[in-house]
Amino acid sequence: MDKSFTLFLTLTILVVFIISSPPVQAGFANDLGGVAWATTGDNGSGCHGSIAECIGAEEEEMDSEINRRILATTKYISYQSLKRNSVPCSRRGASYYNCQNGAQANPYSRGCSKIARCRS
């Protein structure tokens, strides 16, 4: 009785696991010389190539996304700052973008707090 219950419980758990897992197809790919995997469930990414191809495509997408975000920024480094052995603005306290006499280096104002040790 005890052995049959253990066998029944094991088979029930196995059937539940098989039913709940997404279907996966595996086949031999002649052109790649290996096994190609593709998920066919709703949770799959839709990639039907080898694992390396799917991961490679994902990495290319991330790379282009990072490059797009970097290029979309408005901050830039001027050509003058990129020249060898040159200082962008030699005036002490002046902004690199507004290197003029009396130009503010930091045009925004902060509130006074204990940590800033400002004098009132």
Swiss-Prot record:
Listed result of changing R69A: Loss of propeptide cleavage by kexin-like convertase leading to an impaired activity
Site (Required for proteolytic cleavage): R68, R69
Pfam families: RALF
Primary location group: secreted
Highest taxon in the source lineage: Eukaryota
Intracellular or extracellular location(s): Secreted
Tissue: Expressed in roots and stems.
Induction: More efficient to mediate cytoplasmic Ca(2+) accumulation when oxidized, but inactive when reduced.
Residue span(s) of the pro-peptide: 27-71
Keyword annotations from UniProtKB, A to Z: Disulfide bond, Glycoprotein, Hormone, Secreted, Signal
SS bonds (residue pairs): C89-C99, C112-C118
Residue positions the entry lists as glycosylated: N43
Disrupted-gene phenotype: Longer roots.
GO biological process, one term: cell-cell signaling
Post-translational modification: Proteolytically cleaved, probably by S1P, a subtilisin-like serine protease (subtilase).
Keyword Secreted: yes
A cellular component annotation (GO) from this entry: apoplast
MF annotations from Gene Ontology: hormone activity
TM regions (residue ranges): none
Keyword Signal assigned: yes
Secretion signal, residue range per the UniProt entry: 1-26
Stored InterPro entries: RALF
Family of this protein: Belongs to the plant rapid alkalinization factor (RALF) family.
Function as written in the Swiss-Prot or TrEMBL entry: Cell signaling peptide that may regulate plant stress, growth, and development. Mediates a rapid alkalinization of extracellular space by mediating a transient increase in the cytoplasmic Ca(2+) concentration leading to a calcium-dependent signaling events through a cell surface receptor and a concomitant activation of some intracellular mitogen-activated protein kinases. Mostly active in roots. Prevents plant growth (e.g. root and leaf length).
Record protein name field: Protein RALF-like 1
Lineage: Eukaryota, Viridiplantae, Streptophyta, Embryophyta, Tracheophyta
